[in-house]
Amino acid sequence: MPDDFNLKSFLADLPHLPGVYRHLDAAGEAMYVGKARDLKKRVSSYFQKNLASPRIAQMVAKVASVDVTVTRSEAEALLLENNLIKSLRPRYNILFRDDKSYPYLLITGHAWPRIAYYRGATSKRGQYFGPYPNSWAVRETIQILQKVFRLRTCEDTVFANRSRPCLLHQIGRCSAPCVGVIEAEDYAHDVQRAVRFLNGEAREVMDEIEARMLQASTELRFEEAAVLRDQMGSLSKVLHQQTMENVGGDDTDVIAVASAGGKICVNLAMVRGGRHLGDKPFFPTHAEGEQPAQVLEAFVAQHYADGAMPPVLVCSHALPDSGLVGLLAEQGGTRVARVLTRPQGVRRSWLEQAQKNAEMALARALTESGARAGRTLALAEALDLDTDEESLDALRIECFDISHTAGEATQASCVVFLHHDMQPSLYRRYNIVGITPGDDYAAMRQVLTRRFGKVTDGEAPMPGLVLIDGGKGQVEVARQVFVELGLDIQSLVGVAKGEGRKVGLETLVFADGRPPVALGKESAALMLIAQVRDEAHRFAITGMRARRAKTRNVSRLEEIEGIGARRRQRLLARFGGLSGVSSASIEDLASVEGISQELAVRIYDALHG
């Protein structure tokens, strides 16, 4: 520790209050962030002789100073701790990928509610069900609701402009409220039954439909009875196919931890409305040598800090901090009925299945991780890079590609490979402007100057390897940019396509004068290079197409005489995009504010001519 940091005096002055502490290294970087009910007791515990965790002991040996922040409550400390962990990403904290974009099923607050797949903040008017572990689980549930309750899924703009029932009505998946085939009261009843189904009352809904069917039949309303019969048949089929369990109606998260080969998997299974919706595995970083219970606690703290916690948690291990769940529930304004580590009945089978799935996911990850690390090693050996384990894990590869269509909507892409895997959150797109259309060399010069100018300014990291999708010409442009910026050209490598553009025949072109190298189609190093190059190409093309489509959509409407920015916006908002405008009738177009019958005819002719 530095001479100006008196540990003994510092510990003596710490208060017996809740708060957050940060262990800092000699450079002032946060190595570890934690919360405490009692700062004095918690921080002092790190400086005892016998620490249980070798990893934490290693961290304490590097501590140069400690920062503390006193909070008004332990709940406030928990919130601050989570925010600091997310922003600082300390290297000795167990870290989980910040994934808050879980999908929900939304039943809108429309007069004729629609069911929809939804991601994002749950702030729109309507009822939200979830979260679901993946998009597949949401879409499967929507299909069930379509089959059984025939609720609409169309956008409001489409709903407002239908003149006849759509195909979904013809195949029995929608009751066509858009054209008045079903009464508002009957549709509202279907929505209510769908909500009850999602809340786990499937059996009760089934009994209610059966009673209504028998009543309709008794009263000789045979068409209504037939509809209810079909509805009951569809629901019966769903109940037979799905695992619908009566466990008191409480939504449940099942969390199991598995460890092997120095790696840990936390598997989260979600049960909503009595339906097991599937699993989602998480693989934390900085968890080497940690006990499963500690990893589980870190997951619970980070996962539920900003998200809703269900009433029941079923866990494979007891949480070391027994008060954590209560703090999270208090912070989120939710009621957690209980945390179970030795569940009975169906919850026990859920936990056993979650544990098996955690072990299977971990086995797959270990196999894939070994293969990925092997490819990184092969590439490092082929290019004479450092091959120790730490250097390989830290090897950052960036690949640049240019994409356009005959010079239109030129975009450059930069994709990043790090920690033996692609890192989509680090990808970037660059709109290329001020060049001659189709001049790929000028486009490459512009993107490299913009990206690596930030390196020279100290605002961005320098990758260990820079791949250029192109041959000698593109590499020469890149070399010139690096020389101008004072950067090492040894990290520049071009990937030149082989004869017939066949995969496996690529040649590596070096900016520093080394002779070109053909690794061969069986090379693990070339497989990795091809993966990164192809990902850059894919990312560039999707961005270019989106930009081109946006430009064309706007320009096609603006080219029509009488259509300015305001009318264009009204048309696009009313019909949900250019395709909706194109499919609208003249009468539909004329119903938009500011669009006369004459202008509607002109728009229709321009889009269909």
UniProtKB/Swiss-Prot annotation:
The keyword Protease does not apply. Its main location: cytoplasm. Pfam families: GIY-YIG, HHH_5, UVR, UvrC_RNaseH, UvrC_RNaseH_dom. Residues 203-238 form the UVR domain. One of its GO terms (cellular component) is excinuclease repair complex. CDD domains: GIY-YIG_UvrC_Cho (cd10434). GO terms for biological process: nucleotide-excision repair; SOS response. PANTHER family: UVRABC SYSTEM PROTEIN C (PTHR30562:SF1), UVRC/OXIDOREDUCTASE (PTHR30562). The UvrABC repair system catalyzes the recognition and processing of DNA lesions. UvrC both incises the 5' and 3' sides of the lesion. The N-terminal half is responsible for the 3' incision and the C-terminal half is responsible for the 5' incision. This is UvrABC system protein C.
